[in-house]
Regions:
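Signature of Gram-negative outer-membrane beta-barrel scaffolds
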Residues: 1-23, 38-39, 142
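Transmembrane beta-barrel architecture of outer membranes
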Residues: 11-15, 48-50, 58-62, 99, ...
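Extended hydrophobic-aromatic, low-complexity segments
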Residues: 29, 40-41, 74-75, 85-87, ...
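Short sequence motifs at beta-strands and strand-loop junctions characteristic
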Residues: 6-12, 53-57, 66, 104-108, ...
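Outer-membrane beta-barrel translocator domains and adjoining extracellular loop/strand segments
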Residues: 1, 40-48, 86-95, 133, ...
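Extracellular loop and loop/strand-boundary signature of outer-membrane beta-barrel proteins
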Residues: 2-5, 45-52, 60, 97-103, ...
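Gram-negative outer-membrane beta-barrel transporters
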Residues: 80-82, 102-203
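Membrane-embedded beta-barrel scaffold of Gram-negative outer-membrane proteins
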Residues: 21, 27-33, 54-110, 115-119, ...
């Protein structure tokens, strides 16, 4: 839809962090950062015609530990991402097949990332990482359009949910990589496992 928008966004995005190298093998760290992002053009053109999209704000808290030797690396990273007006995928598409988004007032992503790398010899390395997370919208309100037999919009029904999973955000991810090197030749085998995820923010099973 045609738009005539003159919108200004002023952001202050600080970041602070602490890093402690306990010795040559052990390291711990922690950080806090603020990230804000303005809506894209598509958020305006494909959004609700009665209201403009809002800027997204993130408060990111992270802490972790790493261990490293000449043949082994391992680490754990804990994170909590607190969002205000996060722009999330709705599961719907526009007229040309692009994914639609909407603002949700209060949401979060939290979890732990585990990493392991092993290099037992010069020609082989194994890297694996896994993420367990909880990605939720607090007090999600689902707006359901109601049409007549000729697809004319009659009304919009609002359904309140307590806490729902964010669309396209699985609770578990696993990545695995085997890498081989020999006299300038390199090859790798990669695999990924993605846990259960939903195509809408209302956790609809039958889609």
């Amino acid at each position: 839809r045609p738009l005539a928008i003159d919108k200004k966004f002023d952001f202050f995005n600080p970041k602070v962090g602490l890093n402690w190298n306990i010795n040559s093998n052990h390291r711990i760290y922690a950080s806090f950062s603020v990230a804000q992002k303005e809506p894209t053009r598509n958020n305006y053109t494909d959004g609700n015609p009665d209201s403009y999209p809002k800027a997204e704000k993130l408060l990111d808290y992270e802490a972790g530990y790493t261990f490293a030797t000449h043949w082994l690396t391992a680490g754990a990273n804990f994170y909590y991402m607190d969002y205000t007006d996060q722009l999330v995928l709705t599961g719907a598409l526009n007229d040309i097949g692009e994914a639609l988004t909407e603002n949700v007032p209060d949401s979060y992503r939290m979890g732990i990332e585990l990493m392991l790398g092993i290099k037992p010899c010069k020609w082989f390395q194994w890297d694996i990482n896994a993420t367990w997370s909880k990605n939720r919208i607090k007090n999600f309100v689902e707006n359901i359009p109601i049409y007549d037999d000729d697809w004319n919009l009659l009304d919009v029904a609002s359904v309140s949910h307590k806490s729902t999973r964010i669309a396209f955000s699985p609770d578990f991810l696993l990545n695995n990589r085997f890498a081989f090197t020999y006299q300038g030749f390199e090859a790798s085998l990669q695999s990924q496992f993605v846990g259960k995820q939903y195509m809408t923010n209302a956790e609809v099973e039958a889609l």
